[in-house]
Amino acid sequence: IKSGDDADSEAEANLKAARDLIGEAIRLAKPRADELIYCVIGAPAEASIHNREAIIEAAREHVDSVMLCSEPFAVAYGLDWLEDVLVVDIGAGTTDLCRMHGTMPEETDQVMFDIAGDAVDAELAKQIEATCKGAQFTVQMIKDIKERYGYVGDAPERVVVELPVDGKPTSFDLTDQLQAACSVLIEPILDGLKRLIATFDPEFQARLKERVLLAGGGSMVKGLDTAVEKAMNERLGGGKVIRIEEPIYGGSNGALKIAHDMPEDYWEQLK
């Protein structure tokens, strides 16, 4: 379920997909028939009330109680980094930023924008169409190239990929195209960081800048942590960016910890 309100038919299809996904995840966990099922679901930081209700509705037939939390909050909670931390969670459809300062984050502590993994894919496809005459590819091929070779900054090595041209595998150097595509992430991240730092307590802004966590699948782009840190030093007067050890599972690890720790008042009873 992405941000924004979809047309009714697409919204219903998305709801069914989310419902089926939750059901399959629970089936794989093999709960006993007498066990109550509690589910923590990560949502984009600025997900609308409509979309939050849709997520709860998707969970209704499978779980007894549900809790929604912002995805970057789940990352920070799982790492026990809850004081003066900025989390940048780069997913497929959205990049979510969350400012942690010892309490549950409020709306003003969070920023979301829709330049994320899908935007990198779209830019890479555009770059290939413009520079690789006759090259044929699919969305999945683009994702695979990005996930294997994506980088910003100095190229670790030349990236040469085979794509079919009129049925014949043909080698293309995509080094520059990959850098251009992956670089679309940097400016929005910097804008979000600047907004959350500038509106924080001035006494602790310097500490906040030194504790920026990169998470999510998009954080695996090679050199992204270094590039964001360099941009922070140039435009914000300093900064330290750390890529978390488990960028793919950081949010789910945090959600599991939240499920164990949160009292009953925080849960929404569905049954």
State where each predicted segment sits.
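Short acidic, Gly/Ser-rich segments with clustered Asp/Glu that frequently serve as metal-coordination loops
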Residues: 93-94
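Nucleotide/phosphate-binding catalytic cleft detector across ATP-hydrolyzing
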Residues: 1-90, 100-190, 194-212, 219-250, ...
